[in-house]
Amino acid sequence: MLTSPQPRADGRLADVMRPLQITWDPMGFALSSLIIRTGRTSVLCSVCVEEGVPRWRKGQGKGWLSAEYRLLPGSTPQRQNRELLKLSGRTQEIQRLIGRSLRAVIDMAALGETTLRIDCDVIQADAGTRTASITGAWIALKRGCDRLLEQGLLTHQPVIEQVAAVSVGLVESYPLLDLDYSEDSRADVDLNVVMGSNGHLLELQGTAEGAPFSRNQLNDLLNLAEPGLQHLQAFQRSALMQED
């Protein structure tokens, strides 16, 4: 693996994550909520619970989880218009990714016929908003389910595994972990990696923005992502312990 000889603009080495921070429960009426900060990217993640499930799910004794994702108007240098009647393709893609990633680690039977709704609202975008959304939403989801257990509304913990996500990319041929916007905008390859706590991959989203990339370069990026994901999952566990 090529290693960049120069520190990055923010002083990090190639394999170092941006600083992580959690602010708990900024929304008093949600089942659970938090703001996750990774560098200058900030995402508000909240969980709400609803009785019942979608029509196609009724009568199966299983729950459901859905996710929504939005960029708030002031989250980028140029104001983002609110998506009201029609969602952009990017927004639809990201919220489906968040939903798939979280449903993969939920025992729907343990929810009964209950729906959990995840909302991820980007307060400030400096790249990595979808990966921060997944990582933060899992923390909020786990705490929300803990609260349902404490209230006697669930009998079993439905969250069966952790899930976290991180971006890696090739910038001037060098693999970098957890790209910020200045790096993401110059990347020849951008890869989002979603991983469970058992080390299994849940999803890969990779794009050659410039030249095609080789299998060896893909392996280099995955090898860079894995310890970053393990770091994120350790952070998730620590955040839950601190909140308790």
UniProtKB/Swiss-Prot annotation:
Gene3D superfamilies: GHMP Kinase, N-terminal domain (3.30.230.70). InterPro entries: ExoRNase_PH_dom1, ExoRNase_PH_dom2, ExoRNase_PH_dom2_sf, PNPase/RNase_PH_dom_sf, Ribosomal_Su5_D2-typ_SF, RNase_PH, RNase_PH_bac-type, RNase_PH_CS. GO terms for biological process: rRNA catabolic process; rRNA processing; tRNA processing. Pfam families: RNase_PH (PF01138), RNase_PH_C (PF03725). SUPFAM superfamilies: Ribonuclease PH domain 2-like (SSF55666), Ribosomal protein S5 domain 2-like (SSF54211). It catalyses: tRNA(n+1) + phosphate = tRNA(n) + a ribonucleoside 5'-diphosphate. Phosphate binds at R90, G128, T129, R130. One of its GO terms (molecular function) is tRNA nucleotidyltransferase activity. Keywords: Nucleotidyltransferase, RNA-binding, rRNA processing, Transferase, tRNA processing, tRNA-binding. Its EC number is 2.7.7.56. It comes from the Bacteria. HAMAP family: RNase_PH. Homohexameric ring arranged as a trimer of dimers. Phosphorolytic 3'-5' exoribonuclease that plays an important role in tRNA 3'-end maturation. Removes nucleotide residues following the 3'-CCA terminus of tRNAs; can also add nucleotides to the ends of RNA molecules by using nucleoside diphosphates as substrates, but this may not be physiologically important. Probably plays a role in initiation of 16S rRNA degradation (leading to ribosome degradation) during starvation. Belongs to the RNase PH family. This is Ribonuclease PH. The gene is rph.
